[in-house]
Amino acid sequence: MEIDKTKVLEAGKIASQVKTYARTIVKKDVPLLEIAEKIEARISELGGKPAFPVNLSINEIAAHYTPSHDDKALASGLLKVDFGVHIDGWTADNAFSLDLENSEENKRLIETAEEALNKALDIVKLDIAANQIGGVISETIESRGFSPIINLCGHSMKQYELHGGITIPNIDDGRKVVLKEGLYAIEPFATPGSGKVRDGRPSGIYELTSEKSPRSPLARELLQFIKKEYDKLPFCSRWIVEALDSKALFGLRELEANGNLHHFNQLVEVSGAKVSQAEQTILVEENKVTVTTL
């Protein structure tokens, strides 16, 4: 399928505006639920839709923390803000990190991830090998005394598919997969720790993987709602409660047990060390590369 460049660029423009807005509302001790709801509302106000639930991951949690509908957690520490915007399934994915405890190490980690991202963006072109990008990322991060997260990667994106099949590693993994024309997210993670993540607690973030019919009418109705509202893009239990009610959580559990949904885990740095993240989306064309989320 041919990329709808107009929608890709518009999604990126909205993401950029929301990123500027998000930086103004994220403060220490603000409820994460409030931050997520405000970011998602701003996306909708500007004419887009959230491509996935806002991730607000603190310290050693590298990714996949989104507030539940009754979440009480407050913003603190080294906070990663990762959100996406889509227009008819064409996505802009971006992230930034904030130091909410005035820590020199946090600031260095944030600067390191941003520098690694910028150096990666500088070399991206049509037909570049993804592992070459990963090599630049790891060299940059390691030169500042930190480690890249080796089992988290950037990714290609397709319409209604956040992960489109091609990965962009954060190290030189030796796999010479080249970037063709398309949409990609590049996202370095830096840590003073071991440089790997493990599965943590269930995140409340889901993705539709099968349309086989469940038993109960409640679950069947919820399955149709998910297909219509989210297609193959990730969603969360909080959205389901907001759109329907808390009874729908029973249907969600049934769909998970029936194999209709993949339930993502939070991703936690193995040694318990803090993690920073930076991310932008790029559109690779024959003669140019556009960072859509700037």
For each predicted feature, which ranges?
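Active-site neighborhoods and metal-handling regions in enzymes and metal-associated proteins
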Residues: 1-294
